């Protein structure tokens, strides 16, 4: 287990660290990944764990690759929680007109279509053969980085740290072949990335009444590699779960920004993935990184609010004056193999927890032995429960109780919480997001609020929730705000229910979810960049600027208070934004 004070050393990005491998540690199942802020002493950690190597993400964040054999058993401690990569998954389950986009495409003076801007989609890849991503000059994709492909060349000689990179000329060459995959062997195996890229920046297809938000934008596509097996095991995910590591997403953002700079284009990034891990306070490494890059001039990050609003995967409790104990009941499905729970309690309270099995047996969680792992062994059920109690989680100041259930008995489990000092405080409990746990495992007293997934809790992101553009109703599954400390999220609502999307191998279908809303918002951001930067109306536009302009122009109902936890500042309407400017 890594305990070296969260690896916060003193070192520059250009420093070279020894640790050459015969295989790429970023892709190897023999290495564990740890996200670090490396202004302190990474070299000490590398000496502590022989065979360790380092890869910078940017001038603040980097990744340590540590051999699993020298690491010991992975566990959550006060120093390692934020270093262990969280895992993210997909947030999905005639839209363009509802957001004021098509009126701007055809406006006699504006005619905004994303020309001169770049849209990056960081997801499952893309069907690069699809006609909605091609024009008379060939592919509209400038860069396609597939992190999952193995490259047999010298690692140090490639432009990307792992996987394979294909440029527009490679893709154009592939499109001329009878078997394009013999030249560019990158595939979108589930269609999610293709759908998002189409919504954000697909070509106009009048016969299908379809258009992407920014049909003339240049595309940057990153296919994120699957999470390593050791992390999937640690988080107890189902074998078929599609999850991605935080550090790989961060690396994708960093390279997308560098390529946009080479293209000399403003960049709109789309993140249609999310996670319920963390305190929902914007302190996950990915959320912090999104905050950092969205303050850059000419970079915007649009994020899905998540689809956890109706999953019953979140519960909360408030200790008011004189209230001594709160009980939360958890129904566990039959044949549930395992799952994690994160309990986050507001400071300065000290929380005392006990867990009761379906047979009535109660075991206490110790708050006095530090963060080392506690094993709770129940006599009448075969379930093993492992707990780490972190009194002061150092990124937030909150108390974190990290609970892992192995082979949990089906039935009703109870979590008893007491406040030792009886402060007026609140706690939150989150299960994994839908798709990473059985739908029949849920809280009996859930709360739909504070369910926006990370990195939708980042302060500078544009976090998009979803609504039905045909009748104007909110998407029932959409994550709701605010954050535990009252920060406003989501920021905007965009169409995200039964939206027409391009499919892998051609044709069109429909998808729903907040990732769809995030994609449309990313395309809208590209249109704003075209107006502001390409046409020199606001040359120092940042991601935060995009958010503020869209919030100001959002459509709001007269009988509703804004912002609010369901709609944020209202329904995105770019045309109305320009009406206000005039």
Task: Show which residues each predicted segment covers.
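Short acidic, glycine-rich surface-loop motifs adjacent to enzyme active sites
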Residues: 82-87, 251-281, 304, 420
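Subtilisin-like serine protease catalytic core
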Residues: 107-245, 337, 348-349, 458-460, ...
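Extracellular S/T/G-rich loop segment that most often corresponds to the catalytic His/Ser-adjacent loop
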Residues: 152-155, 160-167, 311-398, 418, ...
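Autoinhibitory propeptides
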Residues: 1-118, 125-140, 411-413, 442-445, ...
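Beta-sandwich interaction modules
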Residues: 380-421, 427-433
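Catalytic cores of secreted or luminal carbohydrate-active enzymes
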Residues: 268-269, 286-321, 572-574, 579
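Hydrolase catalytic cores
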Residues: 197-200, 209, 220-228, 257-267, ...
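Active-site glycine-centered loops adjacent to acidic/histidine catalytic or metal-binding residues
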Residues: 123, 306, 513
